[in-house]
Regions:
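Transmembrane alpha-helical segments in integral membrane proteins
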Residues: 137-157
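Hydrophobic alpha-helical membrane-insertion segments
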Residues: 83-102
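Transmembrane alpha-helical insertion/packing segments
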Residues: 2-55, 225-231, 252-287
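Extended, charged low-complexity segments
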Residues: 218-346
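Hydrophobic alpha-helical transmembrane segments
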Residues: 119-144
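Juxtamembrane "helix-exit" motif on the non-cytosolic side of transmembrane helices
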Residues: 37-44, 181-190, 246-250, 298-308
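Central hydrophobic cores of alpha-helical transmembrane segments in multi-pass inner-membrane proteins
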Residues: 53-68
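Loop-centered beta-sheet repeat module
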Residues: 158-211
Length: 346
């Protein structure tokens, strides 16, 4: 999409009634924290609503701001993925500082299961395995999957349009800052830990580098699409699902090395496929579904943060599965309804 096209889309989006523009914003605000913390079984069913409400300003605010930045500038999915990675480092490195805190999971059910110390890098004070897990899940579950799902519910003419005007963006930015401050101030999460100045500067430098990379003009200069040849939606969906589950099961330095190679290959393959003229929203949704279904499957294999009986854990995991199925089924039905519209270029 050209810069002129993005500007015209912004003007068109601004003419829509406010309630119509706010529905997807609210949906993304609440879907992002659910996908980030609940979709993989992190919390019991009775706690999900509270978790979503408390974390919506931070996780949801970030998702909305990243989506608006990409759609307003025409940066598309490359920009979304890079900004999502920046958010992952910002969140884990500067806000809750889980990237550096060796005791971050000490009082949870993951304390006995974590193999993070086996891949700890003494100079940096991080676990390579946890860095991949924390940042990767923020990219896949907190940002990319929720954006793809919410946009799938919209008509094709609205998927690339901004949802908010400047005042709305300011409100969401303030919500994000307040939500982040709330998490940072919660000492029960950080357990009194504060990263060293060197760690904070290093994390901030990585975030800045990712933001600068995301802002490069090259993402707004799209080459002409290749001839038809994109795979059916099931193919990228299954590929993302297998990679998500496989990476989640790996541990140790060998697991870290394999994860980096496999994830890089996945990103390359999706980027290659998306360059074809017949790559559409169904493929985008299938890729998001692969991550969300992978998280729902993982929920049956890992415990929640807090102790729960086997029955409580199973009920919560079933709730997660049903919500994911309902959400994805509805999104797929909406895309099918509009599938006669020309292929999705984002």
């Amino acid at each position: 999409m050209t810069t002129h096209g993005a500007e015209r889309a912004a003007l068109d989006g601004g003419r829509q009634p406010m309630p119509r523009r706010l529905v997807p914003v609210v949906a993304l605000l609440f879907l992002a924290p659910w996908a980030a913390e609940c979709s993989w079984g992190g919390f019991a069913g009775t706690d999900m609503l509270g978790v979503v409400v408390v974390l919506a300003p931070m996780y949801g605010g970030a998702a909305v701001l990243i989506r608006e930045a990409a759609r307003r500038t025409g940066g598309g999915w490359p920009m979304i993925v890079l900004l999502a990675a920046g958010f992952g480092v910002l969140q884990a490195g500067l806000v809750d500082q889980s990237l550096f805190n060796p005791d971050y999971l000490a009082d949870t059910e993951f304390a006995e299961l974590s193999a993070a110390d086996r891949t700890r890098v003494p100079v940096l004070g991080i676990s390579a395995q946890q860095a991949i897990s924390f940042v990767g899940n923020h990219v896949a579950l907190t940002i990319c999957a929720p954006i793809a799902i919410v946009e799938s519910y919209l008509a094709p003419t609205r998927r690339l349009r901004p949802w908010l005007r400047v005042p709305g963006l300011v409100v969401v930015a303030v919500l994000y800052l307040l939500g982040s401050l709330l998490v940072f101030a919660d000492d029960s999460g950080r357990k009194g830990f504060l990263a060293s100045p060197g760690q904070l500067v290093g994390a901030a430098a990585v975030v800045l580098a990712l933001v600068v990379l995301a802002a490069l003009p090259r993402w707004r200069r799209r080459p002409l699409p290749a001839p038809a040849g994109a795979p059916r939606p099931t193919r990228p969906g299954l590929l993302v699902l297998l990679v998500y589950l496989g990476v989640s099961m790996l541990s140790g330095w060998i697991g870290v090395a394999v994860s980096v190679v496999v994830v890089a290959a996945l990103v390359w393959m999706l980027a290659r496929w998306s360059g074809h003229a017949d790559w559409g929203q169904r493929q985008v949704l299938a890729s998001a579904a692969g991550a969300l279904v992978g998280a729902a499957v993982l929920a049956y294999l890992v415990p929640p943060y807090s102790p729960a009986s086997p029955t409580q854990a199973l009920i919560s995991d079933v709730i997660v599965s049903l919500l994911a199925i309902a959400m994805l089924t509805g999104a797929y039905a909406r895309v099918r309804r509009h599938e006669s519209v020309p292929a999705y270029p984002g």
